Amino acid sequence: MSKQLLVDVRPFEISRQQIDESIKENNGRLVVKGVLQRAAAKNQNGRIYPREVLVREAKKYEDVNVRERRALGELDHPESSVVNLNNASHNVLEMHWDNDDLLGTVEVLSTPAGNILKELFRSGIKLGISSRGLGSVEPVNEADGEDGTVEVQDDFELIAFDFVSNPSTHGAFMRPVNESV
């Protein structure tokens, strides 16, 4: 099966007070944290990401992008598998696992797209964080019949995490970080 662009979203909710506290505690920067992705659970797009695939890709992403401060993401999902620097809005600062949840800390950048993202958060807009990657999927036979569920295959490659308006993964709420990062 050929690789396709796979995008999956988790919602983020942040209060105005949390935003203001994060900015104050982080020298003017908005830093948020929460669930980036979930393994071994069906999301709203009908996809299941096997834990071993996500663990491998998260480690690779952290080693190659996060540690070198180039884990950039965009505001909205592009049609491309390449991060466009003109649309960069945030940078992932760290990632770690809590059971099947991939948690992360994200800095909103002072770029045009980052400033839009910050104002959307300040206005109380509910946003989602979404993984973007390339890979193939195979149908999963559910006990109750064909329901369209697919499993992401071993060829999956994680590209970025983007902020979007339409979440697909349950429970990914980002909250501001109120301590210096």
PLM-predicted stretches and their roles:
Residues 1-65:
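Polar/acidic, low-complexity leader/linker segments enriched in S/T/G and N/D
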